[in-house]
Regions:
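Mature-region segments of soluble proteins
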Residues: 10-17, 26-29, 33-44, 48-145
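Ligand-binding pocket scaffold of soluble enzyme catalytic domains
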Residues: 1-9, 20
Length: 145
């Protein structure tokens, strides 16, 4: 495979596209610009070692294999390392379904709005700390732990 990206990036893109292939108007995960979102989601949970473990379990020629072979490799890894596989898959889904392109496809297909879920079209007033004056004067009415 001639690709200017390094082997880890190529393997990751193949992994993403195998886990979430193109289907019914949805793009494959590896075709999108989600590696950054994927890495950020992984880092937020401190799961970099799990991703590294999964990538090391993939054969060097994983990206060059057929879709069926890649699926079989991942099924084998899922059977042997189910916790690792499940964690990585969750991060892939988080990155995929928050991608603007995927959200647009969802909106067209299902009518699910491709925007943040709350306060669409509503402007919130700037918070006024003075509105808490009365509460601050009250004695606590809860038990301290």
């Amino acid at each position: 495979m001639t690709d200017s990206r390094n082997s880890t990036e190529v393997k990751t893109a193949a992994l993403l596209s195998t886990l979430v292939p193109a289907e019914d108007g949805f793009p494959a995960a590896g075709e999108l610009d989600i590696p950054g979102a994927f890495a950020k989601d992984v880092a937020a949970d401190g799961n970099e070692a799990l991703v590294e473990q999964l990538l090391k379990a993939l054969p060097d020629d994983f990206a060059d294999q057929s879709d069926a072979n890649r699926e079989n490799v991942l099924k084998s890894i899922e059977a042997d390392q189910s916790a690792v596989f499940g964690s990585v898959l969750r991060h892939v889904y988080n990155a995929y379904y928050t991608n603007p392109t995927v959200r647009e496809v969802l909106e067209k297909a299902e009518g699910y709005p491709a925007r943040p879920p709350l306060y669409a079209g509503y402007e919130m007033d700037t918070f006024d700390p003075e509105s808490l004056t009365v509460q601050r004067k009250r004695k606590p009415f809860w038990r301290k732990a």
